[in-house]
Amino acid sequence: MDIKEHAEEVWFIVMLVLVLIFFSWNVYYLSTGKSFSLDYGLPTYSGLPEQAQKAVQYFDSHPPSPGQYSEVINGMLVVNLTATQYKWTPDLIVVNKSEPVVLIINSPQVDTGFYLRTPDGVINLNNVAGITSYAYFVINQPGNYTWRDAEYAGYNSSYMTGTVEVVG
């Protein structure tokens, strides 16, 4: 058997084996969950500064009274921000100038986005329904800053806004 006569068949078999190897490899990683995570790319708890993590732990273990969505813990404002159908709760956050802010962002219904332009830059993150996301920032200039839902999820999503009011 001359290899030149059967080069096309050999090439086909080699490529078929490679395709089967890569296909099997991907099936294995997808079926075991090793290649996909809903946390990938999302702002998670571990990405917060250590003091912010401690404040979130305290906030979670000592939740504020009903109707209260924020609490100052060790000089840091911790806000539980929830996105529901076409609104944010709360939709107004009042913070002192240069006061660190930690947002605990929840969305029980749909994927949402959070977009806030501050003098120091943009905070833009996504939130997957049912998975908590976190944001940490400090605004050093008084004023009103509007955040928006950056993920279009349906009718009136573009009107989902809120305001960070920086005083002092």
UniProtKB/Swiss-Prot annotation:
Protein family according to the UniProt entry: Belongs to the cytochrome c oxidase subunit 2 family.
Keyword set includes Oxidoreductase: yes
Entry's EC annotation: 1.10.3.-
GO CC entries: plasma membrane
GO molecular function, one term: copper ion binding
Broad EC category: oxidoreductase
Entry's localization field: Cell membrane
Catalysed transformations (reactions): 2 a quinol + O2 = 2 a quinone + 2 H2O
Gene3D superfamilies per UniProt: Cupredoxins - blue copper proteins
Main subcellular localisation: membrane
A biological process from GO: ATP synthesis coupled electron transport
SUPFAM superfamilies named in the record: Cupredoxins
Superkingdom in the source lineage: Archaea
Membrane-spanning ranges: 9-31
Membrane topology listed for this record: Single-pass membrane protein
Sections of the chain in a coiled coil: none
Physiological role: The terminal oxidase is the component of the respiratory chain that catalyzes the reduction of oxygen to water. Subunits 1-3 form the functional core of the enzyme complex.
Keywords linked to the UniProt accession: Cell membrane, Electron transport, Membrane, Oxidoreductase, Respiratory chain, Transmembrane, Transmembrane helix, Transport
Protein name per its UniProtKB record: Quinol oxidase subunit 2
